[in-house]
Amino acid sequence: MAEAIGLAASIVGIASAGVSVVSTLTKFGISFRGSNDKIDSLAGRVSLTASILSVIATTVEQNASGFKKEEFWRTWRKVLSSCEESYGKLEKALLKARKSGTSKGKGGTDGVSVWGKLVWALGGETEMQDLERSLDSCCQQVTMMHHAVELSVLSLIAQRYTLNFTFIKFAMLIR
């Protein structure tokens, strides 16, 4: 049981990192002459993934007896690590892009759109496309993880129901 609670806490930590990135991304988009559709879309993707991770963490915690940390990590470690890595890259780029807002002259980004600043901070259009693909993949895989966790919970419920039903039938037979 403590294993599953620790697992849930780890997932919450990754979800919190996503929420933090969304907050920073939203503030960044607003701070440079209003919001930008591409920034909003990126924030929406990260927000959705972080929300699903939070739901997974809650489900795992509420059904702790059915989840073994080792098995769960073996199956989903890459997905969670990928999300965490993508959030980290985005957070780092946002910090760099925010600092660039005050720079002038050579290497500065004055007069560049919000999206352009973020692309510049990531290292270029190719890196931005890679990050977007990674975030999309995280969202899809976290959605699959959510479905797998929900199926596990349904399986646990079915096992409990079957055991209870078998016990009731047995109790009726011995009367």
Role assignments for model-derived ranges:
Residues M1-E71, T75, L90-A97, T109, ...:
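N-terminal amphipathic alpha-helical segments
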Residues D37, S41-G44, K78, E85, ...:
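DHp/HisKA dimerization-phosphoacceptor four-helix bundle of two-component histidine kinases
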Residues A50-L53, A57, L80, E84-L94, ...:
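A structural signal for well-ordered alpha-helices, especially hydrophobic packing surfaces
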Residues Q62-M128:
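Charged, acidic
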Residues G105-R175:
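Regulatory helix-to-disordered linker/tail regions at the edges of structured cores
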